[in-house]
C-alpha cells in the first residue's frame, strides 16, 4: 500500500502556502452546546478538530451534529483509542513523543491503526509534544509526560527534527488546554527552522495578538479550544489576526 497525502492534509498545506497559516478550532465532544460552538466557528476556522484528554461520549453523534452545520473538514484529535469516528474526515495520527509511558508514544496509535483503516479515515502523521506548563493540565496528567521546559527550545526542536526523520509531517507544540501561558516564540522559531515540517501551536492562546505573534514566529497552524467555550465570538478576531500574520510572514519570506 502506497502512502500518499490525503485531501484534508493537501487542503491544509494549500492554505498554509497561500495564506501563511491555518486556524484550527478544537471542540470537546463532551461540551453540551457543541452545535452552538460549531455554528460560531464555521465561517472562520479552516478545519475543526474534535477530541479531548478525558473521556469520549457519543463521538459518532457529535461528529454527525457538526457535519450538519458545516462542510469544514473534521479532524479527530484522539485522547485514546476510543477517540475515533467513521464519520470524520481525517485523524491526527500522533505519537506523544515525550511521554514517560510507551503506551502513549506508540501502543495507543498502534492499537488504533486497524480501526483507522477500517473507517477509511485519512491519517495525518504528527508528533505531539507537551511543553511547560502542560504538566499542570489534563494532558500532562493523563499522558504521563516528561515536560519540556520553555527555556530549553533546542529540546523541542530536536524532537521536531526526530519526528521529521520518522516521516511525520506535522508537530504539535502543546502547552495544554487552559494553560496559563503559551509556548514561547523562540521554541516555535527554532523548531520550524530545524525541522522544516508544519508546526502547530496550541494551549494558552487566548488573545488575537498572541496568535499573531506565534504565526510570525513560525507557527503554521494555531489551535484554540477553551476560548470557544468561554467566548465563542472571539473566533472572528482570532481568525483575522492569524490570517494577517500569515500574509506578513509570506511577504517576509
UniProtKB/Swiss-Prot annotation:
Enzyme Commission code: 2.5.1.41
InterPro entries hit by this protein: GGGP/HepGP_synthase_sf, GGGP_HepGP_synthase, GGGP_synth, IGPS_HisA/HisF
Pathway: Membrane lipid metabolism; glycerophospholipid metabolism
GO cellular component: cytoplasm
One record GO biological process: glycerophospholipid biosynthetic process
Family: Belongs to the GGGP/HepGP synthase family. Group II subfamily.
Catalytic activity of the protein: sn-glycerol 1-phosphate + (2E,6E,10E)-geranylgeranyl diphosphate = sn-3-O-(geranylgeranyl)glycerol 1-phosphate + diphosphate
Residue sites binding Mg(2+) per the record: 28, 53
Cofactor: Mg(2+)
Binding site for sn-glycerol 1-phosphate: 172-178, 203-204, 225-226
Function: Prenyltransferase that catalyzes the transfer of the geranylgeranyl moiety of geranylgeranyl diphosphate (GGPP) to the C3 hydroxyl of sn-glycerol-1-phosphate (G1P). This reaction is the first ether-bond-formation step in the biosynthesis of archaeal membrane lipids.
Full protein name: Geranylgeranylglyceryl phosphate synthase
Keywords: Cytoplasm, Lipid biosynthesis, Lipid metabolism, Magnesium, Metal-binding, Phospholipid biosynthesis, Phospholipid metabolism, Transferase
Subcellular location: Cytoplasm
